[in-house]
Amino acid sequence: MCNDYKFKTNMASHGQNSLQTGHYLSEGKHIFAPMLKYIQNEDHYREVISRVSKVNESLWIGTADIKDLYVGKEPFLGVLAGLLERGVDVRLIHAKEPGPVFREEFDRYPVLISRLERVLCPRVHFKMMVFDYRTVYLGSANLTGAGIGMKSSTRRNFEAGILTDEFELVDAACNQFDAVWNGSHCKGCGRREFCGAPLR
């Protein structure tokens, strides 16, 4: 749950109107509005993945598919390992076991084995990232190089999503993630035969 959510705004200069900063001027009054960005194609790498290393408290990731990808020259798994070493709570829900290259890369970071929290659910098809309970990405991009990573613009997938700190959207995303994480749907699930470790 996102009970720790705190509305964050970027104090812009007087007279600057921007939904992206969460601050604008109307009739002499400062009005705070949520940030809402449309994210497409390579924006996923610039606007979403770039935020991962900057979280302070928690990072929740939901994805159907997961493969090895890079953030600049560093493996994404290395970035997650760095977060865990800083004490950040990292949770990952994915739908299927990743391939051998990912598993080999995963094993290079002992902290991932000991501290990364993971849930495998074959019904998960949502793609989301929740940053510090304050900002959320919701969209089509899986956690792969072609989806959200840095694959070239001529080879990557066409993806779309939103990045927002609007409270109701962040809270709804947290609640959906939390329900899957806690196994709320496990008991009556019609696909238990495909699940290696039901939570309930």
For the regions a protein language model found, what residue spans apply to each?
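Signature of lipid phosphatidyltransferase scaffolds
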Residues: 4-23, 137-200
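Acidic/glycine-enriched edge-of-secondary-structure segments
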Residues: 24-42, 63-67
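A conditional alpha-helix N-cap/helix-loop micro-motif detector
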Residues: 38-42, 72-73, 118
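Short beta->alpha connector loops
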Residues: 42-45, 122-124, 140
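Primarily the HKD phosphodiesterase
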Residues: 48-112
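Short solvent-exposed loop/turn micro-motifs enriched in small/polar/acidic residues
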Residues: 119-123, 129, 155
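Short beta-strand scaffold segments in enzyme catalytic cores
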Residues: 127-130, 160-162
